[in-house]
């Protein structure tokens, strides 16, 4: 941060001799501040619902740093009501800093990641349910935005189409018209499946690939010149950022040229500094897909706006490509991790369940 911010001078630090929690450090989630944030969110939910009566439940995943994503279960009494709710929440206090809002049905648990993936797969038509708001207020701490305090926002409507909506399979009201909508989006048929995952893995730029749902693919790739997670980067490297952009474009086009390309509505791309098949991979993936992603820079649509590419690779600082300095990740040494893991008090406790994965990682 280079602006005029308060400065705190620490003159002394005291702690218990055998402190269980010797420090508070914000870094790669889950961290203790995440659960404090969730507790605060629950306390203020009744106030939020009083002002926004359409809201059934709201969840700000700690994996996304709270300000990057909100999953909102919203009532649907009339067409497009969930979108109205999302727009209202973007004006609710510090929720104005949100990068993305996903609205789901009122009976859906917004903490259930499996249900969220199902909704994205079955209830989102890219052309009509993905809404970009340009030039909005951003969080000062969001390093991915090209301008301080300004970025584009994203609303994803993953709710069931109500019967009175012109996109439903019901007959329109007299004097009105129906809006052409795929039958799978109306909920009366299943969509075709993307079947070229093995061909994707053979693409030179792909390190690994994993299908999250029939129409949702995530791939990892190696980017040369990526800022080190330990040090970040304050040095502009225009050539490296240009190469990163070209690599993502090449990778996107290679995948979108496969035979079952029209069945792949969601394509997520991120760095290969994570194992897509490791334990709790999706928690790490949720963090990377939101913290490294800028809507204006990383969201791409095909010509017919039927497919979406979500570039969540780490941007490289560049003055010609509008990438600001990139911060380091708060990491811990192996010695510290081993010491904490061996602490006798920790054997008595487990991290509380935050996201529900239906028994899977």
List each model region and its residues:
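Charged, compositionally biased interaction regions
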Residues: 1-361
């Amino acid at each position: 941060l280079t602006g005029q911010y308060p400065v705190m001078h620490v003159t002394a630090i005291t702690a218990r001799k055998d402190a269980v929690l010797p420090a508070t450090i914000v870094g790669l989630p889950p961290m203790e501040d995440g659960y404090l944030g969730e507790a605060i969110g629950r306390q203020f939910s009744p106030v939020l619902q009083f002002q926004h009566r359409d809201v059934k439940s709201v969840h700000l995943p700690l994996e996304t740093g709270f300000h990057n994503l909100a999953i909102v279960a919203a009532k649907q009494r009339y067409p497009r009501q969930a979108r109205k709710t999302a727009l209202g929440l973007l004006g609710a206090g510090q929720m104005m800093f949100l990068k993305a809002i996903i609205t789901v049905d009122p009976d859906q648990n917004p903490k259930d990641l499996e249900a969220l993936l199902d909704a994205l797969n079955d209830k989102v038509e890219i052309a009509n349910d993905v809404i970009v708001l340009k030039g909005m207020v951003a969080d000062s701490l969001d390093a991915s935005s090209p301008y301080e305090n300004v970025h584009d926002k994203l609303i994803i409507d993953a709710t069931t189409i109500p019967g009175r909506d012109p996109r439903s399979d019901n007959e329109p009201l007299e004097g009105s018209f129906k809006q052409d909508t795929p039958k799978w989006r109306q909920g009366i048929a299943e969509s075709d499946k993307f079947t070229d995952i093995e061909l994707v893995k053979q693409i030179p730029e792909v390190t690994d690939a994993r299908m999250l749902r029939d129409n949702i693919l995530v791939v990892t790739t190696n980017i040369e010149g990526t800022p080190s997670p330990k040090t970040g980067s304050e040095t502009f490297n225009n050539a490296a950022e240009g190469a990163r952009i070209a690599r993502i474009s090449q990778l996107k086009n290679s995948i979108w040229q496969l035979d079952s390309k029209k069945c792949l509505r969601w394509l997520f791309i991120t760095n290969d500094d994570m194992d897509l098949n490791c334990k709790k991979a999706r928690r790490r993936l949720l963090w990377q897909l939101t913290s490294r992603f800028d809507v204006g820079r990383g969201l791409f649509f095909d010509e017919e706006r039927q497919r979406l590419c979500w570039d969540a690779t780490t941007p490289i600082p560049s003055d010609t490509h509008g990438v600001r300095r990139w911060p380091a990740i708060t990491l811990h040494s192996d010695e510290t991790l081993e010491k904490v893991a061996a602490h006798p008090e920790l054997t008595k406790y487990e991290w509380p369940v935050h996201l529900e994965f239906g028994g899977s990682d």
